[in-house]
């Protein structure tokens, strides 16, 4: 008897037909299927009115990046619903793994009692080398990760339920191991990143001498990171 498929929900926090929307979903799907070819992957866009999935039917719930500014006091219903959903799923009896990417990390941090702020560097675009904490080094079996970045908002307070796996809250994990988040974009490559870059100015794409970032066509660890994500989220390797 075959084992059940690896069940994944992608919560898209952007309009799917906006620039880069469907290519981003396609890239996440591709990265998952490199490790789990038979994965059952469904996309839910609360921003377009979709109902968020029953967590008991999922092994992994992925919150994508998105354009809505979570520092705003007034939040649309879909954002409020997403934050409440995160509180419910992390407190409930079913424990699917939850992955947050960029906006997804920020939403998870807010839902779990953390706080956000703006980067004093402005919009950060490029590829960064992220030093890991001892816990992060053990989890990823590496002292650092190289990852795409494209954000201005960041987590300033991780709250009571999250632990840092990298310096500057770049990677977080919940104390119970259910939640893993990245401020960067492990799903991005240079083609996808270029869709979200508004200018060819080399500073904006990581080539500026003072940026500390590499250009978006530099090598990165996206595939390695996603392989580790899938292994972490898979029921048969949930403790590895």
UniProtKB/Swiss-Prot annotation:
The keyword Hydrolase is assigned to this record: yes
Recorded metabolic or biological pathway in which this protein acts: Pigment biosynthesis
The entry's keywords: Glutamine amidotransferase, Hydrolase
SUPFAM superfamilies: Class I glutamine amidotransferase-like
A molecular-function term among this protein's GO annotations: hydrolase activity
Main function: Glutamine amidotransferase-like protein; part of the gene cluster that mediates the biosynthesis of the yellow pigment chrysogine. Pyruvic acid and anthranilic acid are likely substrates for the nonribosomal peptide synthetase chry1/NRPS14, with pyruvic acid adenylated by the first A domain and anthranilic acid by the second. If pyruvic acid and anthranilic acid are merged and released from chry1/NRPS14 by hydrolysis, a subsequent amidation would lead to 2-pyruvoylaminobenzamide. This process is probably catalyzed by the amidotransferase chry2 using glutamine as amino donor.
Name under which the protein is recorded: Glutamine amidotransferase-like protein chry6
Gene: chry6
